[in-house]
Amino acid sequence: MCIRDSPDGHYWGARFPAISIRDMVRAEAQLANILGIRRFAAVIGGSMGGARTLEWMMMYPQRVASAGVLAVGPCASADQIGWQTTQILAITSDPAWQQGGYHGTGREPTMGLGIARRIAHLSYRSEQELERRFANRPAPGEDPIGEDLSMQGRYAVQSYLDHQASKLISRFDACCYVLLTDALNRHDIGRGRGGIHHVLETCEVPAVICAVDTDRLYPLRQIEELADHLPYLSLIHISEPTRRY
């Protein structure tokens, strides 16, 4: 985090305390208290927002009249942790990371952050969508199969990922990215509550769960685990080549 209110007056950087999805929900609940919101008609979210929605259902069921959960499972899977820790490694391996103390040095780990974004963005899109949009075509005006590797151009999908990386670098801090990605790795609604099935089966918040059959990051198996154990639930299956959240 680039907030400059640490005890020593310097940027927090990578020294900022680790946070969890539950920490985020506690902060949201405190904000709701300040705003005078006692109960929500619906709490809705996808991916990290879906993880927070699940925690709202478990932590503050009396404040949630209904919930909508998209693209998330009851806990981070080995596959998801693998995707996400690889993104973190891309950032922390950048020499400009400087052990997370890069703020104010004039050097930021933008290369690592861009690689992390490319990795993440591949997990956000389905194989079918990428093939339909790009296949193995070259980027406009470029030749990716030239004989000289130092001079060759890009494939269309490379150009697309470069664009997504460039957009994120201009608006996001690398320490924030690491902190939030680590929070997703920690996601587990059953931790300290008797296990996933127990906490789901005792939840009384009515919920709609949406599952996309082409989602490579949050597969149907995980979504169906929620559906199998939540007592007040509607499950919606979406067959869609494009992941839209």
Language-model segments: residues:
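Short, conserved loop/helix-junction motifs that constitute active-site signature segments
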Residues: 200-204, 229-231
